[in-house]
């Protein structure tokens, strides 16, 4: 009797978790069939493209996953920006390579089912600001590590402020 109650309780809890999540995924599918990810976030992607890729980025959509989109540029091959939309949340991932060291930065934005133009601009600007800081830190750290690994007189007197 006790095992049956525990089993039913576990099934009930799993249903409470699984059913709303599944409904959100169905909403995503319906929403993205009417309004693909590149159209839904057109302003946001445009601002990121203009500032981070000098307006030369190209969008890549995936037939097998309409929730995923990449933004990259031939001019800046060391940078890839991925967008993943799921359950009303947008995750933007920056992949940036500098001197063979990769920076991966991920930021999630929630509650974006009904997104205004102003919200898209704000999200894009927030992401760009954070990424610019992360890229500068990465370049400084990788550049400093690269210089500090060199031997001989070239490294004498080198400090983090240089």
Q: What residue ranges belong to the model's regions?
A:
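Cytosol-/stroma-facing membrane-proximal "stalk/adaptor" domains immediately downstream
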Residues: 89-162
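N-terminal signal-anchor transmembrane alpha helix of single-pass membrane proteins
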Residues: 1-34
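General structural signal for secondary-structure boundaries
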Residues: 2-3, 33, 51, 113-119
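N-terminal topogenic membrane-targeting module
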Residues: 21-91, 98-103
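Intrinsic low-complexity, intrinsically disordered segments enriched in polar/basic residues
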Residues: 5-6, 40-41, 150
């Amino acid at each position: 009797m006790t095992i049956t109650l525990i089993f039913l309780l576990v099934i009930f809890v799993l249903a409470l978790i699984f059913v709303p999540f599944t409904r959100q995924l169905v909403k995503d599918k319906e929403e993205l069939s009417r309004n693909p990810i590149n159209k839904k976030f057109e302003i946001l992607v445009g601002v990121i493209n203009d500032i981070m890729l000098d307006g030369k980025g190209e969008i890549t959509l995936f037939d097998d996953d309409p929730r995923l989109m990449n933004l990259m540029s031939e001019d800046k091959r060391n940078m890839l920006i991925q967008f993943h939309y799921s359950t009303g949340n947008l995750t933007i991932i920056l992949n940036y390579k500098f001197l063979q060291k990769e920076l991966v930065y991920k930021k999630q934005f929630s509650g974006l089912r009904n997104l205004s133009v102003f919200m898209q601009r704000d999200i894009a600007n927030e992401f760009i600001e954070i990424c610019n800081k992360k890229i500068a830190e990465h370049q400084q750290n990788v550049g400093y590590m690269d210089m500090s690994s060199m031997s001989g007189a070239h490294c004498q007197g080198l400090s983090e402020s240089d």
